């Protein structure tokens, strides 16, 4: 246990706070001793697309994206998982007032599934009755039914049909159903998955998309190396397809203000220091900062007598996910465990314990799987998993 006390936000506090073992603080959220605040709404939100009052800063990014998609160009946005790509895009897109559809390619299983999913999403914003004349141009007519439970339109194609023909017909319909003055916005999330859905799918999509005039494409991706290869490799079909934009962490000062103002309702004069503690632990990661702040706020409301609300919240989150963390730890090999432990402790990876090529390959795999991210250095994506590793060491 580290005994040295540091002022929150000081030059060394992020290192010390980031690696000290979890303090044995136990919470019982069932015991609500603060009746006065029990009906207050938690001002922090995580896990879903964040909008309106829960949205954090990103004013410049939103303004840039909104202005950019008012042109006839396409946008490519690269950012690590849980950095808020979808929230930023959705805020900018909604400000344009134009119709849009959004599809996560991680949920797409095949080319025919991609075609059906795009058509399904389009039916949500454009009634099928207004598209019947365009559907007659389909070389393979889809089966469209209404879900009796949700009332939504379900789209499917007969098995065994030419999937590339299906996709071409659907993308052509999306373009023909709109005009240059009122372009449809098509958002494809986790776009790097295009390479795993089917061979040469990227070539087919690029050949269709580059001829369209009535659609703005926004292509999002979380795998830095794969997205860069798709859009910056001269041999790639999508080379220079659109404006390339990278979304980093939130500026600390802006994020601190956001957290402090919302924590003040529970912690009054202590909110500045608590905001610093949160950002020191999370490294200003948007998702995990919101998650920790939400749990700290809960501690302040339900157990206001808790001496260190931040570490109480960290302890609670880590214990809540301990079984998942253990399962993950047991599923990876010893090289990966060593790398995660070294990164958790803030130590170098070039120690001679493993060959440099072995470490490099392992880090790249961990990065692809989402366990490790790189900004100015390699680090664990999940600070709570980092804390679990340190506690188990």
Regions found by a protein language model. Name each.
Residues 157-223, 232:
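Conserved Walker B catalytic segment
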Residues 284, 290-357:
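Winged-helix-like regulatory helical subdomains adjacent to P-loop NTPase cores
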Residues 353-369:
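Short amphipathic alpha-helical interaction segments
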Residues 386-393:
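Short, amphipathic alpha-helical interaction segments positioned at domain boundaries
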Residues 2, 9-75, 80:
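A short, basic N-terminal segment
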Residues 229-280, 301-304:
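Helix-loop-helix "sensor" segment of P-loop NTPases
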Residues 71-74, 78-83, 87-184:
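P-loop NTPase nucleotide-binding core
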């Amino acid at each position: 246990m580290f005994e040295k006390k540091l002022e929150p936000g000081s030059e060394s506090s992020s290192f010390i706070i980031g690696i000290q073992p979890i303090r044995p603080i136990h919470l019982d959220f069932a015991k609500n001793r603060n009746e006065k605040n029990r009906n207050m709404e938690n001002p922090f939100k995580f896990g879903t697309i964040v909008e309106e009052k829960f949205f954090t800063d990103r004013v410049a990014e939103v303004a840039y994206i909104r202005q950019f998609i008012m042109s006839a160009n396409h946008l490519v946005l690269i950012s690590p998982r849980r950095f808020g790509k979808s929230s930023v895009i959705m805020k900018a897109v909604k400000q344009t007032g134009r119709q849009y559809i959004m599809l996560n390619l991680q949920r797409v299983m095949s080319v025919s599934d991609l075609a059906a999913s795009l058509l399904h999403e389009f039916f949500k914003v454009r009634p099928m009755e207004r598209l019947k004349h365009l559907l007659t141009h389909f070389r393979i007519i889809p089966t469209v039914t209404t879900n009796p439970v949700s009332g939504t339109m379900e789209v499917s194609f007969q098995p065994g049909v030419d999937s590339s023909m299906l996709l071409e017909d659907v993308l052509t319909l999306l373009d023909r159903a709109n005009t240059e003055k009122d372009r449809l916005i098509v958002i494809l999330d986790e776009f790097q998955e295009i390479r795993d859905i089917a061979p040469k799918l990227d070539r087919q999509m690029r050949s269709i998309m580059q001829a369209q005039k009535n659609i703005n494409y926004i292509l999002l991706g979380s795998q830095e190396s794969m997205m860069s290869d798709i859009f910056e490799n001269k041999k790639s079909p999508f080379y220079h397809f659109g404006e390339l934009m990278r979304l980093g962490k939130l500026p600390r000062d802006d994020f601190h203000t956001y957290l402090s103002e919302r924590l003040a309702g529970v912690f009054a004069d202590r909110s500045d220091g608590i905001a610093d503690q949160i950002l020191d632990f999370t490294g200003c990661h948007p998702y995990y900062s919101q998650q920790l702040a939400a749990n700290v706020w809960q501690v302040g409301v339900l157990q206001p007598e808790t001496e260190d609300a931040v570490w109480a919240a960290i302890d609670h989150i880590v214990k809540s996910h301990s079984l998942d963390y253990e399962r993950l730890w047991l599923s990876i090999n010893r090289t990966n465990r060593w790398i995660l432990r070294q990164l958790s402790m803030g130590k170098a990876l070039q120690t001679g314990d493993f060959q440099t090529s072995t470490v490099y390959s392992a880090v790249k795999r961990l990065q692809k799987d989402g366990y490790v991210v790189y900004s100015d250095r390699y680090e664990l994506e999940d600070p709570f998993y980092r804390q679990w590793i340190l506690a188990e060491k």
